[in-house]
């Protein structure tokens, strides 16, 4: 029973972290959409609005910039709790989730962060558009990585529940067989 609670708590921590990240990228979607899926010529204000939005993010107070680190710590605690169990399933599912998390972090660090910094220095519309397209593409890639983490964690949780239910059924059957003797 304690193993079940640990598994549930781990999944809750990781999923809460993932859904917080989804919310963050969802708020960016209203600006990113035009650079991925629409014709910019049909939306002449898209570049200026996105530029203003990401410039404001760069100028945000430091406390707001540190909030995502709390989210990462929550996810790290959840993944650490899973990896601490050292079962094959935990190593496979939580290890793959960790790889996806590191991939998302590296995508953010190498694509999003530099592009946001470049926006404030860019003077040509082509430079701005290129940086905004890089941000939008990186956000999409990060969202796919987060979706992979959610899928892995839910699958692992369901498989563990099935295994636990099968163990209980076997124990009940063994107890019933023992009683009937």
Where are these regions (language model features)?
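Non-transmembrane, juxtamembrane loop and terminal tail segments
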Residues: 165-181
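Eukaryotic polytopic
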Residues: 83-160
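Interhelical loop segments of eukaryotic multi-pass membrane proteins
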Residues: 30-51, 98, 117-125, 164-170
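Juxtamembrane membrane-interface segments at transmembrane-helix boundaries in membrane proteins
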Residues: 1-3, 46-64, 123-139
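Membrane-helix exit/juxtamembrane interface segments
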Residues: 21-46, 91-95, 105-115
């Amino acid at each position: 029973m304690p193993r079940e609670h640990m598994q549930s708590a781990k999944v809750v921590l990781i999923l809460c972290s993932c859904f917080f990240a989804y919310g963050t990228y969802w708020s960016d979607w209203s600006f990113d959409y035009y650079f991925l899926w629409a014709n910019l010529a049909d939306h002449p204000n898209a570049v200026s609005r996105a530029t203003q939005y990401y410039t404001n993010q760069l100028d945000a107070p430091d406390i707001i910039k540190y909030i995502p680190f709390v989210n990462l710590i929550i996810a790290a605690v959840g993944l650490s709790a899973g990896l601490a169990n050292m079962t094959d399933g935990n190593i496979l599912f939580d290890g793959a989730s960790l790889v996806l998390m590191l991939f998302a972090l590296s995508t953010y660090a190498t694509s999003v962060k530099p592009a946001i910094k470049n926006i404030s220095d860019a003077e040509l519309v082509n430079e701005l558009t290129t940086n905004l397209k890089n941000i939008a593409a990186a956000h999409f890639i990060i969202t796919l990585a987060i979706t992979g983490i959610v899928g892995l964690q839910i699958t692992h949780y369901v498989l563990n529940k099935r295994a636990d239910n099968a163990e209980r059924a076997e124990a009940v059957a063994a107890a019933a067989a023992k009683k009937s003797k």
